[in-house]
Amino acid sequence: MERVEDSQRATSDSAFNRMQLSTCRFGIKDNRITCAERPRIKSLESVGKNYGEDGKDSKNVTIVQEPAAERGVGMLSFSYDDTQRDNETWLYLSALGRVKRIASGNSDDDAEPASVFGSEFTTEDTDTGKLEEYEINILDETTESGREVWKIELIPNAQRALKSRYSRTVNYVDKERFVVLRVEMFDQYDNEIKRLLASRVELVNDIWMARSLTM
């Protein structure tokens, strides 16, 4: 998982990226999990830079390009590797010309992580670093989208559990490219409540990254 984190940091460091977020409610059809509605798609552009000791802190700006009604809405995120520092996020509402600080789910034990651009992604889902706040277990070696992967479980420790809506996540990590291809997220009753699928994995500046994420 440290290799995955390092790759994620490298893709955002002093780099300009375009990405597509797709979100939908999922259901079961023909014994397969699939979208139960038309996906809501947002096209984003982002730029970031890593700071701090070993370059493990980061600052990132993300701007919505599509749909047109949301163009110009932006998000500024500061992520810290230090477990004693909470990550910080601000949202710029272009239609109102206002900046709003949004909850990360870290600064207040009772706060729900905020939605990212009105999608099923939350600030918790986009957090990086702080792997020491999790118990990490390799559950299996399998395949995902035709790729050999490790199936890795992350369970938050007592401190992190107070800030998380997930009791655990299961990550399918590409063995060769160190990209997470799928994440299953479970609630306190061990019910899967969300699933992330990554696609359009491309080599950018010698780093593999997913250009499309569906939640």
Per-range role (PLM):
Residues 118-137, 141-142:
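Surface-exposed beta-loop interaction hotspot
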Residues 65, 76, 87-92, 98-127, ...:
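Gly/Pro-enriched, hydrophobic low-complexity segments
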Residues 6, 43-52, 135-143, 199-201:
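Short amphipathic beta-strand and strand-loop transition segments with alternating hydrophobic
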Residues 45-52, 61-62, 104-108, 132-137, ...:
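Short, surface-exposed, charge-dense and proline/glycine-enriched linear segments
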Residues 11, 56, 130, 146-148:
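A short, polar/charged loop/turn motif at coil->beta-strand junctions and beta-hairpin connectors
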Residues 6, 21, 129-131, 161, ...:
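A generic signature of intrinsically disordered, low-complexity regions enriched in glycine/proline
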Residues 1-95:
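N-terminal mature ectodomain segment of secretory-pathway/periplasmic proteins
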Residues 61, 141-142, 168:
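Intrinsically disordered/low-complexity terminal segments and short unstructured peptides
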